[in-house]
Amino acid sequence: MRTVDDRRERLARLIDLARVYRGWTRTEIAKALDRDAGKLLPDSGNPKLDLVVGLADALDWTIGDVAEDLGTEAVVVSPEMDLRSLDREAVQCHRSGNWRGMIRTARQMMALASTAEQRAVACNRAAGGFDGLGLFSRSLPHLQAGLAEPGLPEGLRLMLTVNLANAHYAMWHLVESRAASREVIDTLSDRQVEDRRTQVCRAFAHYVRGSSTRRLAMLDPERGALHASAARPDLQESMVSYEDLADTYADDRYAAMANTCRGAMIEVEVRMGHMGAREAIDRLVVAVERVVDVEHHPPGDWLESWGWWCIFGCNVILHHLPQEELPRPMAIFSNKANEIAERLDNWSLRERAFSMELARRDLTGDDPWILDMEDIRSLVGTMGRFPTFRDRGYRILKSARLLIPEGGPRCAGA
């Protein structure tokens, strides 16, 4: 944690930058920040919100940029640390789900990095940590910074690019996600890929492009069948590639990804008119019934995959069943998706589960939601991570009955 002196020093530096940028005197910067020229810096080093806003205006930065610059923890690097051991530590953090530890280690890697490749690897590790926390808007700049480094090995550049595509996909930036994934696919289209990392990049790129195009069918329903027809070959290619990877490397995570592609293809085949909605729902229900007790089901990629099957089921029901047939199957899928999202602490699944349940209630006119404190925490966290969801989140809060303990915090809808 930063000391008072550290915080004051960093704040003073930003004020000086703003003064130089604007060509202002100390008196002029004080006036712009609505502060006394003799006491620009608070004793604690912690600026109030109006000072952060004033600095952002003076610097032509965003408020978030100023807050991040002021709030970033000092990086502690000891003499015995080296990049190779730190990278191994970051990988271990990823495998164990220690996302904050991964970000901390990535920052130490960045502090020690002296080459473009080392900086790019550190950026990729930091992005992975933010991805794990569902903070995709914070993973994006790290991936973009990594890709801005010159002379990177092709494999590393491809990995950064496909991770960038996935971050955009998670944020519903479908134009960007399709463009970045296409870059990877086109680069590898005319060659035999043998090394494992590049095989994974190609499989993942097809998954992201296919999934992005599948989502585009929901946003552009008039051309939904056309988008679904474009999505299916990518999802098929990704499924086959992940099945091959699972067999070659005996890694069940790849089999789970193949399973997610298989479920997504059911949704697009309904959109294409190649499968009836009721047949698709029956197949999806039978599949997700394998997860009887979410709380005691092993966490991991397979459980997440079944969570996405629930979302595919919701999509089929919402877009292809008569309204009177919605309630029961929709509730099965949305409730199961929410349980899995909570079990895995998966923010992308939470966003979809909340959105699907809201859509169901809008159509059926069911009684308002009843949200307890845990539900509210999940909802607020989802609103912060997905700007496109924020309006829906406020709608839920406004209409829900909130179960808040006596003396607890109040919010809209309470």
Pin down the residues of each PLM region.
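Structural signature of alpha-solenoid helical repeat junctions
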Residues: M81, Q118, E154-L156, E194-C201, ...
